[in-house]
Curated annotation (Swiss-Prot):
This is Paraneoplastic antigen Ma1 homolog. Belongs to the PNMA family. The gene is PNMA1. GO terms for cellular component: cytoplasm; nucleolus. Coiled coil: none annotated. It comes from the Eukaryota. The lineage of its organism: Eukaryota, Metazoa, Chordata, Craniata, Vertebrata. It is found in: Nucleus, Nucleolus. Keywords: Nucleus.
Length: 353
């Protein structure tokens, strides 16, 4: 679970997960200065910077993400460190050695009934090469990985798009346009292949009128990019809301009864991005616009709303989406903890009487 959090957090912040540490088990009431003091005492030889902190609900404690900024001696990084409230745990991903890489490579290919030579032959490498072993130079291992194994895996096993036809009534397995486009943007960003291959995979998901649109465009412009294809589909099949309509919808989206404020922020974000796309809000003002609307729309989170109002009134830039969610989740955790304590106290009083 901790390793998954480390990888997801790093991916969300565009940080190399092998150059990062996750420190968790930090008490909720531990402030920034106390965290920094503990880290410095436990890792005096390690150069790092703290990227962020969050409340980890499953552990009922805070977690901190650190980026390693210098030459790293992984032997100097402790797996645990003494801190406020007990022992803090440390999770990281040291670089894989050549021997470990080879072992994993052979295991993977063996499960599929392949050898490295088989893969090289299929991909057009006619010259036979010796089976890789621990003595093979790292440059050759990297070449095999980048030019043989990764392309094979990516070409055979990749996440496919859902189907879209553009028909008024979607057929079996087909999506309407807005959900399809959102899913397509997410998946296409994950594909580590050329734009030509991305366009081919995009065409795989299209049926009927939608496929006809892209075929016509491709006939007129054989070099059309995947992004241009998506833009064309949006112009043909997307909503025709004006920038004013989108902005009004954004400003009239409020927190629902029983909805956590963090969930409201996540629900609000696609609308905000659409407002930006329509040009109603400048990209430079996105964080401020988000904060103002969250404060205005937080109908059912009074205490957190007051904290956010103080954040907005303070000098300095408004928090970005990630920082805002971290702040809100920490406040939600405090409220839940206070509510649980109040419930226990009430049970105790009822039992006494």
């Amino acid at each position: 679970m901790a390793m998954t959090l480390l990888e997801d957090w790093c991916r969300g912040m565009d940080v190399n997960s092998q150059r990062a540490l996750l420190v968790w088990g930090i008490p909720v009431n531990c402030d920034e200065a106390e965290i920094e003091e503990t880290l410095q005492a436990a890792m005096p030889q390690v150069h790092y910077r703290v990227l962020g902190r969050m409340f980890w609900r499953e552990e009922n404690a805070k977690a901190a993400l650190l980026e390693l900024t210098g030459t790293v001696d992984y032997a100097a990084i402790p797996r645990e460190m003494p801190g406020k409230g007990g022992v803090w745990k440390v999770v990281f991903k040291p670089p894989t050695s050549d021997a470990e890489f080879l072992e994993r490579l052979h295991l993977f290919l063996a499960r599929e009934g392949w050898t490295v030579q088989d893969v090289a032959r299929v991909l057009g490498f006619e010259n036979s090469s010796p089976a890789p072993g621990p003595d093979m130079p790292a440059e050759m291992l990297n070449y095999i990985l980048d030019n043989v194994i990764k392309p094979l895996i990516e070409s055979i096993w990749y996440k496919k798009l859902t189907l879209f036809s553009g028909r008024d009534i979607p057929g079996p397995g087909e999506e309407t346009f807005e959900p399809w486009l959102e899913h397509a943007n997410e998946v296409i960003e994950e594909w580590q292949v050329s734009d030509i291959e991305k366009r081919r995979r995009l065409m795989e998901s299209l049926r009927g009128p939608a496929a006809d649109v892209i075929r016509i465009l491709k006939t007129n412009n054989p070099d059309i990019t995947t992004a241009e294809c998506l833009k064309a589909l949006e112009q043909v099949f997307g909503s025709v809301e004006s920038s004013r309509d989108v902005q009004v919808r954004f400003l009239n989206t409020y927190q629902n009864p029983g909805e956590k404020l963090s969930a409201y922020v996540i629900r609000l974000e696609p609308l905000l991005q659409k407002v930006v796309e329509k040009g109603a809000i400048d990209k430079e003002n996105v964080n401020q616009a988000r904060l103002e609307q969250v404060i205005a729309g937080a109908n059912h989170s009074g205490a957190i709303r007051r904290q956010l109002w103080l954040t907005g009134a303070a000098e300095g830039p408004a928090p970005n989406l990630f920082q805002l969610l971290v702040q809100i989740r920490e406040e939600e955790a405090k409220e839940e903890e206070a509510a649980a304590e109040a419930a226990l106290l009430q049970l105790g009083l009822e039992g006494h009487f």
